């Protein structure tokens, strides 16, 4: 926003700057939401409907940037991926393989899901579904631990407690684990979902 006229500014900003926030990974959700809504009201295209075309265009671009910034920064995983991007990094193919710490869990759950898909007897299906519900709890616990590790990594970045290269490696590892656990939870939930009655 222009400090003089209150109009939108079309300058290229990073997503933190778009919301007027410092580049920090630990973000208070209420503050993020408040900034998003306050800035959104100030640069909303309706406020500039009678303005010059360049001002209208800047308002539209500013609103789009603001919305993208909010969506990315409110989700810790998206924020972590964006942080990697800001640091010239991304998850490589190595980080997209099953993390060794999760290999046994992923294998066991996928095996149980395959058995459930192939089960033809209702009692076998019910028994397998019960076992998979238990596995879901185990996967959710692993997800909670990974999210805690992500929060700790964010705090280390913000406090400058470790060397950036080691923090990037740790961040990549944690984001990779979360990606696998999200996929596993999605697969479990999909298989446990009751069949649709619409036909």
Q: What kind of region is each of these model predictions?
A:
Residues 1-199:
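C-terminal accessory/regulatory regions appended to core domains
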């Amino acid at each position: 926003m222009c400090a003089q006229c209150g109009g939108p500014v079309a300058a290229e900003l990073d997503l933190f700057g778009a919301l007027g926030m410092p580049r920090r990974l630990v973000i208070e959700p209420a503050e993020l939401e408040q900034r998003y809504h306050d800035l959104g009201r100030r640069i909303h295209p309706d406020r500039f409907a009678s303005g010059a075309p360049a001002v209208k265009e800047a308002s539209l671009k500013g609103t789009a940037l603001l919305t993208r910034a909010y969506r990315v920064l409110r989700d810790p995983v998206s924020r972590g991926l964006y942080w990697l991007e800001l640091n010239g990094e991304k998850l490589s193919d190595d980080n997209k393989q099953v993390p060794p710490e999760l290999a046994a869990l992923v294998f066991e759950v996928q095996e149980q899901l395959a058995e459930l898909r192939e089960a033809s007897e209702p009692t076998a299906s019910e028994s397998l579904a019960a076992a998979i519900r238990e596995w879901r709890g185990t996967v959710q616990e692993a997800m909670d631990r990974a999210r805690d590790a992500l929060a700790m990594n964010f705090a280390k970045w913000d406090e400058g407690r470790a060397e950036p290269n080691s923090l990037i490696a740790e961040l990549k590892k944690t984001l990779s684990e979360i990606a696998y656990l999200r996929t596993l939870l999605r697969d479990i939930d999909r298989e446990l979902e009751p069949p649709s009655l619409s036909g």
